[in-house]
């Protein structure tokens, strides 16, 4: 730890924020030591679903898992995976082992821990399809607890862990299905081509909003209102996808939040639909 560490590389919007307390634990004991020394913590994976609202953070200790808390082990068609493992790395490792189930997420820039909290989804699949169990740390009792899949409530863009206060996901166990590499690669190639044609290549945190109950995609409504390309500061509604905001270089968290509020107001005014953010504001 040092005075004010940049968080730019730890959020996919590439917001230029800084924090006084930043830690990179390598094991459970180091994590417990950090928990015991700070009252206010934020556990960060790859930062693919977060918005830093401030330039400087003095009161929050950021615990980043993707740098050192990121090992996994594959035996037969099972994998034990620490929270900081990137979905992309796990997807390629399982592909090389002729295992199917996680390849849908190979282009999702999220960590396993973050994906489990939000029940990450892509192209109709959800992360919990392959989950066997999730192990967490209770920050109050300092106890480690394993949840079997049958005991985990989850649904569209949420899991039980999203609403549990003072917990931290440590690891998960996955069960995959054997398939030929050719079949898995065909799916990887299809996802890659769809992403290239439909999604922006600039810094972004992906879909900003949950799909509304009206079941009309936010991107379609934004496009119908002619809002694609709208910009506040360097935050812009992607010209490629109306449900995504990109950073054109120097967007602040406040630029992004102002643009989110603008979109919400426009959708409410013209469609009478209230949008809810999928992303987490810190």
UniProtKB/Swiss-Prot annotation:
A GO term, aspect molecular function: UDP-N-acetylmuramate dehydrogenase activity
Coiled coil: none
Active site: 157, 207 (proton donor), 278
Record localization: Cytoplasm
Protein's GO biological process: cell division; cell wall organization; peptidoglycan biosynthetic process; regulation of cell shape
Keywords of the record: Cell cycle, Cell division, Cell shape, Cell wall biogenesis/degradation, Cytoplasm, FAD, Flavoprotein, NADP, Oxidoreductase, Peptidoglycan synthesis
Record-linked Pfam families: FAD_binding_4, MurB_C
Domain FAD-binding PCMH-type: 15-179
Family: Belongs to the MurB family.
Protein known as: UDP-N-acetylenolpyruvoylglucosamine reductase
Gene: murB
């Amino acid at each position: 730890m040092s005075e004010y560490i940049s968080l730019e590389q730890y959020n996919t919007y590439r917001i230029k924020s800084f924090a006084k307390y930043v830690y990179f634990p390598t094991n459970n004991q180091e994590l417990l030591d950090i928990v015991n020394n700070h009252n206010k913590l934020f556990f960060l994976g790859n930062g693919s679903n977060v918005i830093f609202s401030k330039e400087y953070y003095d009161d929050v200790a950021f615990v980043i898992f993707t740098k050192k808390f990121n090992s996994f082990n594959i035996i037969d068609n099972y994998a034990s995976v620490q929270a900081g493992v990137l979905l992309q790395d796990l997807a390629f490792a399982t592909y090389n082992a002729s295992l199917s189930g996680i390849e849908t997420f190979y282009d999702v820039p999220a960590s396993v821990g973050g994906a489990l909290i939000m029940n990450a989804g892509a192209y109709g699949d959800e992360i919990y399809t392959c989950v066997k169990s999730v192990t967490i740390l209770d920050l109050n009792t300092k106890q480690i607890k394993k949840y079997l899949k049958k005991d985990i409530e989850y649904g569209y863009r949420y899991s039980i862990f999203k609403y549990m206060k003072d917990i931290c996901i440590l690891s998960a166990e996955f069960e995959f299905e054997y398939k030929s590499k050719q079949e898995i690669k065909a799916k990887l190639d299809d996802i890659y081509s769809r992403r290239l044609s439909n999604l922006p290549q600039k810094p972004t945190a992906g879909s900003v909003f949950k799909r509304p109950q009206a079941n009309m995609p936010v991107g379609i409504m934004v496009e119908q209102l002619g809002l694609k390309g709208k910009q506040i500061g360097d935050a812009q509604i992607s010209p490629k996808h109306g449900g995504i905001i990109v950073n054109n270089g120097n967007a602040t968290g406040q630029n992004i939040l102002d643009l989110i509020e603008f979109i919400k107001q426009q959708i409410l005014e013209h469609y009478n639909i209230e949008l809810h953010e999928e992303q987490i504001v810190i």
